[in-house]
Amino acid sequence: MSFELRFKEEALSEWRRLDGSVRGQLKKKLAERLENPHVPAAKLSGHPSRYKIKLRSAGFRLVYEVRDAHLVVIVIAVGKRERNTVYQAAASR
């Protein structure tokens, strides 16, 4: 069962500013997560239904939320890991 992908408005703006190669890598990982979004190793602490995708080589993170009742994965924030900015942005949204 595949989940539908949606973006928060702020996350979509961040997504559009990404370099094409980074966006391509994230797209590939997102496609995998739409099939199975609940990855225990990627769960964010303090948020019951939020997970992350890491691009270790590029230093980027994507934070998403899973809504099982509607079969939706919502991208909350996309950005660099530096100084936890992507996690702070996700916490405020």
Residue ranges and their predicted role:
Residues 28-55:
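A short, surface-exposed loop/turn module that caps and links secondary-structure elements
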Residues 17-22, 43-46:
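Short, mixed-charge, low-aromatic patches
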Residues 2-6, 10-17, 24, 38, ...:
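Enriched for short, Lys/Arg-rich terminal
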